[in-house]
């Protein structure tokens, strides 16, 4: 039976599965902080396809594999034939025969979807123009670590300030899946599309919580437990000049001390990073005591560990002692015969 599962869109996962991955990631994190690196990915190899530059995603994925006994290969743009001389289908089938798991950060979501369709091993979406699921899991893990006293996730409200980037969309997907109230505080023309919002509303209907889109700062920030923002000009924004975008977002949608003061007194600030200091967020907020961005960045690795172990767990069938001894003896004999033949 084919047990392959991809991590391309968290909407294909249940709340129970997400909760399991959060707990798995935190347990592995606890184990490593106490000095034990569980070999949960021993002898497993991750291939990483990057059509874009990356700091947090690449380093967290490589470190996650290494710490758990596996290995990661970086496949840079121009070094592999992905949709160039060779079709995505063919490249994916080849990589699926050589690697144990594939991660891909791509320009277009359909690319990672195709890799997932044709590769016979699990495929992880390291970010596309549609969503950023590994960021989602790291973020929700960080929220669990910083829950307000006496609250659970389903009691919390999160506000995403600014543009409806793929991180905004992903934040809505994940938080509504966990029963939270989600608000996008952003200008018209930069709000989430209706079909995307509908997914969040379906989650809210099933799990509780709500989805709100508003241009009213007071309405958005009232009783917020978490406030999140992203850059105003990102990897996929090339249709409007940067200066024009800045004029739309600044100063109303900048996360500063004045805006944060409208939230609850225990509010936490989040950012997927990299941040453009002085634009979408001030230094005062980013470096404040209520900023949890560095924990959030660290939990990218926590999330990667959980995702890789969860997806690869069905294939972790290690040989029995008897089988290992059988092959050790056969290899020893074959290598001895090879040496003898060279010496004759």
Curated annotation (Swiss-Prot):
Putrescine binds at residues 271-274. It is found in: Cytoplasm. Its EC number is 2.1.3.6. The keyword Metal-binding does not apply. One of its GO terms (cellular component) is cytoplasm. Pathway: Amine and polyamine biosynthesis; putrescine biosynthesis via agmatine pathway; putrescine from N-carbamoylputrescine (transferase route): step 1/1. It is an enzyme of class 2 (transferase). GO terms for biological process: arginine biosynthetic process via ornithine; citrulline biosynthetic process; putrescine biosynthetic process from arginine via N-carbamoylputrescine. Carbamoyl phosphate binds at residues 54-58, 105, 132. The record marks 29, 145 as: Important for structural integrity. It catalyses: carbamoyl phosphate + putrescine = N-carbamoylputrescine + phosphate + H(+). The keyword Magnesium does not apply. One of its GO terms (molecular function) is amino acid binding. Keywords: Cytoplasm, Polyamine biosynthesis, Transferase. Homotrimer. Belongs to the aspartate/ornithine carbamoyltransferase superfamily. PTCase family. Catalyzes the phosphorolysis of N-carbamoylputrescine to form carbamoyl phosphate and putrescine. Is involved in the degradation pathway of the polyamine agmatine. NCBIfam families: orni_carb_tr (TIGR00658), PRK00779.1 (NF001986), putr_carbamoyl (TIGR04384). This is Putrescine carbamoyltransferase. The gene is ptcA.
